Swiss-Prot record:
Keywords: Cell wall, Secreted, Signal. One of its GO terms (cellular component) is extracellular region. PANTHER family: CELL WALL-BINDING PROTEIN YWSB, FAMILY PROTEIN, PUTATIVE-RELATED. Disulfide bonds: none annotated. The lineage of its organism: Bacteria, Bacillati, Bacillota, Bacilli, Bacillales. This is Cell wall-binding protein YwsB.
C-alpha cells in the first residue's frame, strides 16, 4: 500500500472509531466546565500521539476559536498532546517543538499498543455488557478515551481494538506506560 493510501486508511479507521466512541453524543460547548487535565497528572499514559484529521487545522494561542491564530497544521501532521482544556481543546506540541491549542474535534488518537494487567473484560460501552474476556498480558490497541454523555472524557474507560473487535476496557486493568 502506498504512503498516501496508508495514511488515508489509517485516518479513516481512526475517525470511524472515534465517532463510534462518541456514541452519538453531541458537543455541548456552553456546558463544559473550564478544566484543564494534564496527561502527566492522570497517569503515565501512552496517549500523547495524535494526528490531524482535517485538511487544515488552525493552531490557536488560547483554547478558544476567537483567540489569535498561531499556525496551521494539515491532514496527517503529528502532534504530541500536553493537556486537555475542557473536552473541546487540547494543548499540543507540534513541528519543531512549538506549542499551541487545537480543537479536539479535528484530531484523532494514533493507536498505541498496551497490555492487560490481569484477566480483563471488553465491554460494548462504558456502561454496556461484556463481549469478551482477555487473559492477562494480552496486547490491545489503545484508540482513545471513552466520552461522557456531555461530550467530555471519561478517563476511567478506554476504547480499544483487539483482533478486529472494538470495545471498552477499564483503564485500571491496563498497563499504561510511555
Amino acid at each position: 500500500m502506498n504512503k498516501p493510501t496508508k495514511l488515508f486508511s489509517t485516518l479513516a479507521l481512526a475517525a470511524g472509531m472515534t465517532a463510534a466512541a462518541a456514541g452519538g453524543a453531541g458537543t455541548i460547548h456552553a456546558q463544559q466546565p473550564e478544566t484543564t487535565v494534564s496527561i502527566d497528572d492522570l497517569y503515565s499514559y501512552p496517549i500523547d500521539s495524535y494526528l490531524v484529521s482535517a485538511e487544515a487545522l488552525n493552531v490557536r494561542t488560547k483554547p478558544s476559536a476567537s483567540s489569535q491564530k498561531a499556525d496551521t497544521l494539515h491532514l496527517g501532521d503529528s502532534l504530541k498532546l500536553i493537556s486537555f482544556s475542557n473536552a473541546d481543546w487540547a494543548k499540543v506540541k507540534y513541528k519543531n517543538g512549538k506549542t499551541g491549542f487545537v480543537s479536539t474535534h479535528y484530531i484523532v488518537k494514533a493507536a498505541t499498543t498496551v497490555k492487560t494487567k490481569t484477566k480483563t473484560k471488553v465491554y460494548t460501552s462504558a456502561d454496556g455488557k461484556s463481549i469478551k474476556t482477555l487473559p492477562a498480558d494480552t496486547s490491545v490497541s489503545f484508540l482513545g478515551w471513552s466520552k461522557t454523555n456531555k461530550g467530555g472524557f471519561d478517563f476511567d474507560w478506554v476504547f480499544v481494538d483487539y483482533g478486529g473487535t472494538t470495545g471498552y476496557m477499564k483503564t485500571k486493568d491496563l498497563h499504561m506506560t510511555k
